[in-house]
């Protein structure tokens, strides 16, 4: 019986790692070195840390999982996840843990397989826009934006990777009058 429990634990660990590897926020943080020169090692460590967190805390609420993942992303990768994916990943991990607790290795294998089939490769490419603030000084301020594109990672699937869409294009762009002379950007509250 202990062998079956160990097998399910291994499947749970693999499912957790698959979910984290497919998480676009973590992919971007690793690819752009937000965690420093050891970003890839931190991402691998993150899988084990999340697995251990679930094992040590048997009855976790969704908010606790979100807080834990958000804290790890902030401390290890200097990244605040604001794309709405944190609750989705947390829910997915919580479902995996429930399957682990029931000893349902088949469900864990199925979830891992589905994640690997749908896995998208996300890349962030910088877009540079420049605005002259003072013609006499020839001083140019630039605002760097990131364009996120999703490409299939070679998996054979007919599904299309969803592109993140801004909720309101007018609120997402930095208006010219919001950039003042000294390079600061004025942030306005939504109305």
Swiss-Prot record:
Annotated signal sequence range: none
Region Disordered, annotated ranges: 140-175
Keywords of this entry: rRNA processing
Presence of keyword Transmembrane helix: no
GO biological process, one term: rRNA processing
Keyword Cell membrane found: no
Described purpose of this protein according to its UniProt entry: May be involved in 20S pre-rRNA processing.
Family designation: Belongs to the TSR2 family.
Name the record gives this protein: Pre-rRNA-processing protein TSR2 homolog
Species of provenance: Mus musculus
Gene that this polypeptide is encoded by: Tsr2
């Amino acid at each position: 019986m202990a062998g079956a429990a160990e097998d399910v634990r291994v499947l749970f660990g693999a499912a957790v790692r698959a979910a984290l590897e497919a998480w676009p926020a973590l992919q971007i943080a690793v690819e752009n070195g937000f965690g420093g020169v050891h970003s890839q090692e931190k991402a691998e460590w993150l899988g084990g840390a999340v697995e251990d967190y679930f094992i040590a805390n048997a009855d976790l609420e969704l908010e606790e999982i979100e807080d834990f993942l958000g804290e790890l992303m902030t401390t290890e990768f200097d990244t605040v996840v604001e794309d709405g994916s944190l609750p989705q990943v947390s829910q997915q991990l919580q479902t995996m843990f429930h399957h682990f607790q029931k000893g349902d290795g088949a469900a864990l294998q199925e979830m891992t397989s589905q994640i690997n089939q749908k896995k998208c490769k996300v890349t962030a490419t910088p877009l540079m826009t420049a605005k002259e603030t003072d013609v006499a000084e020839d001083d140019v301020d630039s605002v760097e934006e990131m364009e996120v594109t999703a490409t299939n990672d070679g998996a054979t699937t007919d599904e299309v990777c969803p592109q993140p869409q801004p909720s309101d294009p007018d609120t997402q762009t930095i208006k010219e009058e919001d950039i003042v002379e000294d390079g600061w950007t004025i942030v306005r509250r939504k109305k």
